[in-house]
């Protein structure tokens, strides 16, 4: 293992070979012989080290990261405080299983989650390994606490790849195709999608509520599960008033409001959580991704009376809340505070949105620029329409890849380009990435 000084990869994007380079090509041949073909690969290189917003591949190319490992490395790569915390913990002990012999860092993470999640009510948390596991446990808790079974989800939603979370997820390919049968008592409602439906938040909420009450019945609903800003579904930001109206309805009807903040949480949108933008206080909130800076940790935080309704032994998992992941999460939270990264997310969002809106004036394929904080996207359309233009998105991602810039596509129809830079990216790095992206968009449009 090399030190952080020895492993410095520089701060500028730099290509020394074509993408992919010869070593990555050879590595990919090895991969095909031993790794399941069911795993995709968005960027065709193999990484050996990373620092800040730069990844270095095995050919020596420096790649600019505008994806953060899908909103995970929010504080950047190889942050010294995180590296030190993890290294020290590994030297002490790596695992005991919290359910067998517990440790303080698990409790500290739960205390921090109580502090930073919305609301001043009493809360408790349980820690797990992945976002899907957190969502699955949130639903499990809601069903037990309410004595009801039905779960409301929304069009374009993504909640994971386990059997239950596949049922909760909207898009078939690649997430669900031929993996059924899926868990039952899941009911899908229309999402507020201002660019496509033109409805106000109140109108969109009334539409969804009417369908719930007519097709499911409020008294049968255990939980309403929603991403405050949808992630894989296309960075869809609901119209103002949509989330508050749903929250009000759930409170009135004894339904547990679960905010899936796995992609949108931990400062990504310019607040600790996306629901904070409209003052929504969920009954439960799921976290993962940015929570632990790349370590596999997730959490469910909720009203104490809900979380504590579960019988002893009803929650858990061998690795959930592993001590190494817990100290990583504590380091992430410290760095977020000390470097004022939530404010930085707002600055980045202003810069990205401004640049993309200028580009939109000249390029007809950009239907909408949307998002909050450093969670910004472009929806690409056929010129003069709102019809999805997935071919343009594919072309843009391919060009960015060839230039050593990671840009990710998403959306139910594959026509959205999303930007999720580390919050520690420099202004110069961001400008460089946006310049490459602009060239790609102009070529595609």
Residue ranges of predicted features:
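Conserved N-terminal phosphate-binding loop of PLP-dependent enzymes in the Aspartate aminotransferase
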Residues: 2-445
């Amino acid at each position: 293992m090399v030190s952080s000084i020895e492993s410095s990869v520089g701060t500028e994007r730099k290509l020394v070979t074509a993408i992919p380079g010869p070593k990555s090509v050879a590595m990919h041949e090895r991969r095909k012989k031993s790794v399941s073909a069911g795993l995709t690969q968005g960027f065709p290189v193999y990484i050996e080290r990373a620092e800040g917003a730069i990844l270095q591949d095995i050919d020596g190319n420096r790649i600019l990261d505008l994806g953060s490992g899908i909103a995970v490395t929010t504080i950047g790569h190889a942050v010294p405080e995180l590296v030190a915390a993890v290294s020290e913990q590994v030297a002490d002990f790596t695992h005991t299983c919290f359910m067998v012999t517990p440790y303080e860092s698990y409790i500290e993470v739960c205390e921090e989650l109580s502090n930073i999640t919305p609301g001043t009510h009493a809360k408790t948390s349980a820690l797990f390994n992945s976002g899907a596991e957190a969502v699955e446990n949130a639903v499990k808790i809601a069903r037990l606490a309410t004595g009801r079974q039905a779960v409301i989800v929304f069009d374009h939603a993504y909640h994971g790849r386990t059997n239950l979370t596949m049922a909760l997820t909207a898009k078939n390919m690649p997430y669900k195709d031929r993996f059924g049968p899926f868990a039952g008592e899941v009911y899908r409602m229309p999402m507020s999608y201002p660019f496509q439906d033109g409805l106000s938040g109140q109108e969109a909420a009334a539409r969804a509520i009417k369908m719930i009450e007519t097709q499911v019945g409020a008294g049968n609903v255990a939980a309403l599960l929603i991403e405050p800003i949808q992630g894989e579904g296309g960075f869809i930001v609901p119209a103002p008033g949509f989330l508050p109206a749903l929250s009000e309805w759930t409170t009135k009807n004894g339904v547990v409001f679960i905010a899936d903040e796995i992609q949108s949480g931990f400062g990504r949108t310019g607040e600790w959580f996306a629901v904070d933008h409209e003052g929504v206080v969920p009954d439960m909130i799921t976290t993962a991704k940015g929570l632990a800076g790349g370590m596999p940790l997730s959490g469910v935080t909720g009203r104490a009376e809900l979380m504590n309704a579960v019988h002893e032994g009803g929650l858990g998992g061998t690795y959930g809340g592993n001590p190494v992941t817990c100290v990583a999460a504590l380091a992430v939270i410290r760095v977020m505070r000390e470097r004022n990264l939530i404010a930085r997310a707002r600055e980045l969002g202003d810069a990205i949105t401004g640049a993309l809106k200028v580009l939109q004036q000249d390029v007809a394929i950009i239907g909408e620029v949307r998002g909050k904080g450093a969670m910004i996207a472009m929806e690409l359309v056929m010129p003069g329409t709102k019809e999805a233009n997935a071919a343009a998105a594919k072309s843009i991602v391919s060009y960015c890849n060839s230039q050593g810039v990671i840009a990710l596509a998403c959306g139910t129809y594959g026509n959205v380009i999303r930007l999720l830079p580390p919050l520690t990216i420099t202004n110069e790095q961001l400008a460089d990435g946006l310049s490459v992206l602009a060239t790609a968009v102009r070529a595609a449009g």
